[in-house]
From Swiss-Prot:
Keywords associated with the record: Nucleotidyltransferase, Transferase
Role of this protein: Transfers 2'-(5-triphosphoribosyl)-3'-dephosphocoenzyme-A to the apo-[acyl-carrier-protein] of the malonate decarboxylase to yield holo-[acyl-carrier-protein].
Entry-linked NCBIfam families: malonate_mdcG, PRK01293.1
Gene that encodes it: mdcG
Major enzyme class: transferase
Coiled coil: none
Protein name: Phosphoribosyl-dephospho-CoA transferase
Keyword Nucleotidyltransferase applies: yes
Catalytic activity: apo-[malonate decarboxylase ACP] + 2'-(5''-triphospho-alpha-D-ribosyl)-3'-dephospho-CoA = holo-[malonate decarboxylase ACP] + diphosphate
């Protein structure tokens, strides 16, 4: 890997044994190296990358670690909303994919993508989507974004054919866009835990 994967990226490993520190027994039965794991937030004194494994059931989620040199492929949330990929998906008729296609019609000033079950389905073509699936959206925001533009995003999201939630990723963590615009502050999820802040683009002193 030429760059370090970021939270929400999907990564593939070179071997099943590359997945470290997994305690849940179902992982050995359901996961194989042909399936991706998702990068999560955590810190490690061995410089490993924190990942999560998705099981067949909604409640089946397991946390583990991987060494960067064992990652052979990385798909970012932004890659999953390329129009050609969305239109060519076997799930193109599902509401979350239709919603993502609708969002691509507007020239947003930021990079964005999809995560969660929709992202997993688009990346793997595994049928984990259904008619009632939500759409999890991610906006990359290395710098503060214009509030009015973000309100326009939320207005368009509210018109989508499925329920959708937006997380905004800053250099210091991620927060729920709706919460921040409504309350003026939000819970910022960082690698060291969550903290309530009105300034998610500033490092905590």
């Amino acid at each position: 890997m030429s760059s370090t994967p970021r939270p929400h990226d999907l990564v593939w490993l070179n071997h099943a044994s590359a997945l470290e520190a997994i305690a849940e027994p179902w992982v050995a039965q359901q996961w194989r190296a042909a399936l991706p794991v998702v990068v999560r937030r955590d810190v490690d004194d061995q410089a490993r990358i924190p990942v999560g494994v998705r099981g067949m059931k909604r409640e089946q989620r397991a946390a583990g670690w991987v060494q960067a040199h064992n990652i052979v492929r990385c798909v970012t949330p932004e890659m999953l909303v390329e129009r050609e990929r969305l239109l060519g998906s076997p799930f193109v008729s599902q509401p979350p994919v239709q919603a993502a296609i609708a969002l691509t019609l507007h020239p947003w000033s930021w990079r964005w993508g999809v995560t969660g079950s929709t992202g997993y389905a688009l990346a793997t073509e595994i049928p984990v989507l259904h008619a009632a699936s939500d759409l999890d959206l991610l906006i990359r925001a290395p710098q503060p974004l214009d509030r009015e533009a973000l309100r326009e995003w939320l207005a368009r999201v509210a018109q989508l054919p499925c329920r959708a939630d937006t997380q905004v990723e800053t250099p210091y963590g991620a927060f729920a866009l709706n919460e921040w615009l409504r309350d003026g502050r939000a819970l910022l999820k960082t690698s060291h835990g969550a903290r309530l802040t009105a300034t998610p683009w500033h490092r905590e002193e």
